[in-house]
Each structure stands twice: as C-alpha cells, then as structure tokens.
Amino acid sequence: MAGKGEGPAIGIDLGTTYSCVGVWQHDRVEIIANDQGNRTTPSYVAFTDSERLIGDAAKNQVAMNPVNTVFDAKRLIGRRFSDASVQSDMKFWPFKVTPGQADKPMIFVNYKGEEKQFAAEEISSMVLIKMREIAEAYLGSSIKNAVVTVPAYFNDSQRQATKDAGVIAGLNVLRIINEPTAAAIAYGLDKKATSVGIKNVLIFDLGGGTFDVSLLTIEEGIFEVKATAGDTHLGGEDFDNRMVNHFVQEFKRKNKKDISGDARALRRLRTACERAKRTLSSTAQTTVEVDSLFEGIDFYSPITRAKFEEMNMDLFRKCMEPVMKCLRDSKMDKSMVHDVVLVGGSTRIPKVQQLLQDFFNGKELCKSINPDEAVAYGAAVQAAILSGEGNEKVQDLLLLDVTPLSLGIETIGGVMTTLIQRNTTIPAKKEQEFTTTVDNQPDVLIQVYEGERARTIDNNILGQFVLSGIPPAPRGIPQFTVCFDIDSNGILNVSAEDKATGKKNKITITNDKGRLSKDDIEKMVQEAEKYKSEDEEHKKKVEAKNGLENYAYNVGNTLRDMGEKLPAADKKKFEDSIEEVIQWLDDNQLAEADEFEHKMKELESVWSTIITKMYQG
C-alpha cells in the first residue's frame, strides 16, 4: 500500500526516444501533459555551461550542443560496453561513450566547464525525475510510488538497471512491468464493455528503440501472457539511421563532401529525416530540407514513401519473425487470434501495418488505443491496483506475465541446464538437485545463464557464486539443491544448499558485471539531489534576471511616456541608470540571483525618488 502523504502512485512509460506518465484519478486514467502541453516528453538530457535541461528543452537545443545532449540511454542500460549493439550505436551518437569498470558503458559530457561521467542508469533516472515532476505539477502533491515499464524482451540485467534508475530518482518502484502487457490492460479496459468470453490478443509494440510482441488471453479481467518475443534493439531510430546514411551518401555524391564527422550537421539532418519519416506515414512523397547543412551548402532532396520502404524493407520484414515465434511458442494458429493491437509510434508506418495485416490474412488491425499512450495508461492502472487506489473496475484485474528467456546453470562440459523455461508465468520457483564432478570436491561454482542455446558460451552469463564447505566424499555422492526464484518484476534470485550440512549460499542475480553497487546507487542518489538543487538555483537566477530586465524596460517605457512632466536633469539621470543596468545585464549573464536582486533594489530606489519628486513638484 502507498504510504499516506505520498500522493497517488503513477505509471511511467520510460521510452527510448519519448516517455509518458499517467495517473488513476476520478475512476479513470489521466495521461499528463508536460509544461509544453505535450503528452509525451523526449527522453533527452542536455548539459550546458550554465544548466541541465531535460525533455523538450533538451531536444530543442540538440543541434547547437550535440556532444553534450544525451539520448538513447535505454539502448545502453544493463548492457556491456563491448556488446555488438553498443558498438554499432556509438557510430550514430554524437556524445562520447567509453568503457568504465567491469566493461560498463559510461557517458562523458561537459557540464558547467567540467568533464562529468554518467552511467546510463543516471541519465534514465533524470528522465524519471522529469516524469515525476510533470505528474507532481499536475496533481499538486509530491509523489513517491511508481510502476515503471520495460520492453518484455529486456533481460535480467536490463530490468535490474531500470529499477536502479528508479531508486536513483528517489522513487519507490512498486513493480517493473512489461510494455506490451501494460498496453494489453489499456486495450482490455477499452474493450471491457463489449467483450465476452476468452479473447486471444496479439500486442505488436514497435517503438523508438525496442520491439516486442506478446500474445495474451484475456478473460474476465485475467490477463495471461502466453508467450513473448522481440528485439530490444529495433525501432524507429533504426529507420531514421537508414535515411540519414542514405542522405549522407547523397550529399557526398552531389557535393564531394563528407558530413559524417560533423555532429551538428548530422543532428540537423537526423531531425529533418525524423520529420520526413512521420510525414511519409500520411503522404506518398515529401522533401528533406536543411538550410546551410555543411560549409554553407543548402541540402534539399525529395523522398518517396516507396524509397523509404525500400531502405528499411529488411527491418520491416524482421518485425514479422517475433510474431511467428510468439504463435509457435503459445501453440496457436494465427486464425485463433481475435485482435491484433498496434502499440508504439512506429506502428503508424503503413508498410509495417500492411505486412502485419497480410500475415494475418487481411484481418483488420485494432487501432482504437493511442499507440503513444497505451503503455503509460496500463502502467497507471497497475500502479492504482498495487497501491489500492483503483475502483472495482480495475481492482479485479489480474496480470499473469512471463519470463522472456530460459534460465539455467552451467553443468559439466559447458552445457546449459535449464531450470526455468522461457515463457514461464511469473512469479515462479524451481528446484533441481545436482552433485559433484570430482572426488573430495570442497566447493562448487554455480554459474547462472539466460538464453536458448545448448552451450552456455552462446548464452548470457548473469552471475555466479560459490557453495563451499562440502564434506569430502567421492564424486556423485554429495547432493546439493539449486533453487531459482523469479519475483513479479522478473528479477531472479538463485540459492544453493548442501543437503548434508545444510550450508546455504544465495545471490540476487543482478549481473555483478556492470551492476551498480549499493554504494554507487547511494552516491548517485545524493548527486541527483545535488543536480536538482542546482537546477532550482539556476531557475531562481533566471527568474531574477528576467525580473530585472523586464523592470528596466518597463520603467524605461514609462519614462518616455512621462516626457515633459520630468525635469530634464532627472530624466537624464534615470535614463543613465537604466542604460547602466542594461549594460550590466549584458556583461553579467552568469551573475547570481542575489546580484540581480540587488541591482533591482538600486533601480527601484532611484525610480521611487524620481516619482516622489514628481508628485511633490
């Protein structure tokens, strides 16, 4: 239950490119608009000489400051620097990423004249703080509890790292839930009045950076995930990348100049490509235009929908593979699917819709829920359920989710011995007995892996621990039990117990490689607080500066209007004071708030003597 005085629990869709926040209020979900009036907020954080910007403000200045504007943290979170996907993404990022301790990717930026380094969890935590602040401004109360969503195909380390980001942001993460499952709740509530009996629903969720497909059965408020598949590295940004590459080559052909090393030019081109991609979802042709793209050369090039489709056809077709896998895993024929639901901004692409519709033999796709907001909507419902706030309409909903990847340990010969199969409903617990492989073996190394391959070398290692103190005995005699326990966030605990001695050891699989330690998180929480107070200081400063500027211009205008009523000497004296303040403002852009306030007082006192004189005269 949420504690009193903590405000309602919110649902946050933490996206690769955009994030969205919702809350259950007055018996319905409210998707909350930010201070710009937008219901989704860019997952961008920018660092400048004077301030930190998050959301729209960060994305709006990206062309001016590409190397210090960080986005795509979700493509780094819970991954290793040496991951092939990280290496390929780095080619498209203007900001610097280098390997930190234990192969953890670290982001380097320049902030207030100093080089700073951040983990992906910290950048994501800044976006989470922004989403919380958007909700707090709307609700007028402080918020502590949240449900945060992740791609269904996120692995254990990516989930754990997302949870850590929530902790750094000062949130109590009630639950990590899968994005397609959250979207299914939005669909289920939308269809509740008209739905009778069991429905098999396929959620096709193609976002800015990740892709998930989940197949659920929905009956009487029970949402049971049968299977899930996907690609944690496929989305709208990959379609943008293809377009950017195409136009970089075209620019090279036409102008014999290579812009690939110019971060600002690439960013401006990318923004134009993103806009063109969106336009091509509703028209057959558009133009990509960027004035003075590189060395004063204007870039102007038409692009047709057909050309855009041709550039990305292999990626669009790739989207169909997880659909087939999902049907296979849930042992269902495509004719048994009642509804195919589109989620995520990239499902607006006509070709993606056409391929999906053709796969389902011309079946109408379900477009009744908002693809940008459905995930946050479902997260807000789940937040209301977990904090006991929802009405009877939602309190009887039950979510039965699954684990996306098989989990097991390495046994002799590097074999993967699976304890929990993929698509097992969570929470889940499974025990299995093992024995020693060498005579008088005193301890056993237990290595935990996730993946579907027969050899552990081809799977992903999650962590390892040692069970020691096994009494000397011939091999095959000692018996020890390994227990896998997955909680409702999809996070794994593994324990082992020696039968004879009762000795135990356990590990929460948190990917020791690259996982933030308790101390790291504590330090980051404190830094987040520090950045927050710096942001507030900066805001105060800007308000004081604007206040002084407005005051100087306003009294200047009033002075001109008064014209002849004032003696020339007084008028001149005051005009000089205003001129001096305006000059001072130009020279002291970075002054502190109290300096602006002090100048304001000086100007006010000069003005009040003049006014007094005038009325006495």
From Swiss-Prot:
Gene Ontology BP, a term: response to heat
Q: Which UniProt keywords apply?
A: ATP-binding, Chaperone, Nucleotide-binding, Stress response
State the name under which the record lists this protein: Heat shock 70 kDa protein 18
Which parts form a coiled-coil structure per UniProt? none
Lineage, opening ranks: Eukaryota, Viridiplantae, Streptophyta, Embryophyta, Tracheophyta
Underlying gene: HSP70-18
In the record, the note on similarity to other proteins reads: Belongs to the heat shock protein 70 (TC 1.A.33) family. DnaK subfamily.
InterPro entries the UniProt entry points to: ATPase_NBD, Heat_shock_70_CS, HSP70_C_sf, HSP70_peptide-bd_sf, Hsp_70_fam
Q: Which Pfam families match?
A: HSP70
Q: Which GO terms describe its molecular function?
A: ATP binding; ATP-dependent protein folding chaperone
Entry GO CC = chloroplast envelope; cytosol
